Amino acid sequence: MSKISPLAIIEDGAVIGKDVEIGAYCIISSDSTIGDGTKIEQNSCIYGKTTIGKNNHIFSHAVIGSAPQDLKFAGEDVELIIGDNNKIREFTLFNPGTKGGGGKTIIGSHNLFMGYVHIGHDVIIGNHCILANAATLAGHVEMGDYAVIGGMTPIHQFVHIGEYAMVAGASALAQDVPPFCMAEGNRATLRGLNLTGLRRNIEREEIDEIKSAYKELFEAGKPLKDVANEILEHTSSHHVQSLCNFVLKTKRGIPYERKHL
């Protein structure tokens, strides 16, 4: 049974699932869909064409689905899609997509968004990610599964962050971070592998293969894409293939300095 405060504003047309809780002074717009078991605390607002999955917990004063902060936005039909079992903390801001970026911002499941996190238009985030307090993702950023962004860290438009990658707190990232890697600094550069994250879900033998590929990529002194192609010719590791394919597809480049290796 849903529990909706009489002080909340639920516009006609909004779809509210089973066992949903909505606190006082919340606003749920007419185009919104709230999945079963989701809890929305007081003073939070769900705007626009926003679809929220099951068992999410949205804390107070979050603003979800408000118009994208893009000067080209002219009221087009755009949307925000959020998966299941996410925790979205206080004063977070999530924008929908834009016409020029595909029209959708897409958030996966089992993610933690700490206070004051900003998710810009057309962002795509996978599953099991953590964004610490005041992490800021500009438009079109993409994050793979299990990626971590430290607090007070801005991410430039169009940056891609691979699965299991980590960007340290108080950094500023303007280039792509490959899977399994760790970046830190302003501007952030690679600082090795995110071994703590890897050990949670990846077998030791696979980690050793990732380590070997990482050193080969960044110590060879040759163009990264040449080395990536060479590694792909002889590896059977799914994780190493993911690392090398990311390097081959990067558009913003990989921020690394050989001296740190």
UniProtKB/Swiss-Prot annotation:
Q: Which Pfam families match?
A: Acetyltransf_11, Hexapep
- The enzyme's first-digit EC class, named in words, is transferase
| Keyword Lipid biosynthesis assigned | yes
Q: List the disulfide bonds.
A: none
Job of this protein: Involved in the biosynthesis of lipid A, a phosphorylated glycolipid that anchors the lipopolysaccharide to the outer membrane of the cell.
- The entry's protein name is Acyl-[acyl-carrier-protein]--UDP-N-acetylglucosamine O-acyltransferase
Spell out the subunit comment.
Homotrimer.
Q: Which PROSITE patterns match?
A: HEXAPEP_TRANSFERASES
**Per UniProt, which keywords does this protein have?**
Acyltransferase, Cytoplasm, Lipid A biosynthesis, Lipid biosynthesis, Lipid metabolism, Repeat, Transferase
Q: What is its EC number?
A: 2.3.1.129
Which residues, if any, are the signal sequence? none
Q: What is its main location?
A: cytoplasm
Among the GO biological process terms of this entry, one is: lipid A biosynthetic process
Q: Which catalytic reaction applies to this protein?
A: a (3R)-hydroxyacyl-[ACP] + UDP-N-acetyl-alpha-D-glucosamine = a UDP-3-O-[(3R)-3-hydroxyacyl]-N-acetyl-alpha-D-glucosamine + holo-[ACP]
Gene3D superfamilies linked to this entry: Hexapeptide repeat proteins (2.160.10.10), Udp N-acetylglucosamine O-acyltransferase, C-terminal domain (1.20.1180.10)
Q: Which GO terms describe its cellular component?
A: cytoplasm; membrane
What pathway is this protein said to act in by its record?
Glycolipid biosynthesis; lipid IV(A) biosynthesis; lipid IV(A) from (3R)-3-hydroxytetradecanoyl-[acyl-carrier-protein] and UDP-N-acetyl-alpha-D-glucosamine: step 1/6
InterPro entries of this UniProt entry?
Answer: Acetyltransf_C (IPR029098), Acetyltransf_C_sf (IPR037157), Hexapep (IPR001451), Hexapep_transf_CS (IPR018357), Lipid_A_LpxA (IPR010137), Trimer_LpxA-like_sf (IPR011004)
Output the SUPFAM superfamilies linked to this UniProt entry. Trimeric LpxA-like enzymes
CDD domains given for it?
Answer: LbH_UDP-GlcNAc_AT
Q: Where in the cell is it found?
A: Cytoplasm
The family assignment reads: Belongs to the transferase hexapeptide repeat family. LpxA subfamily.
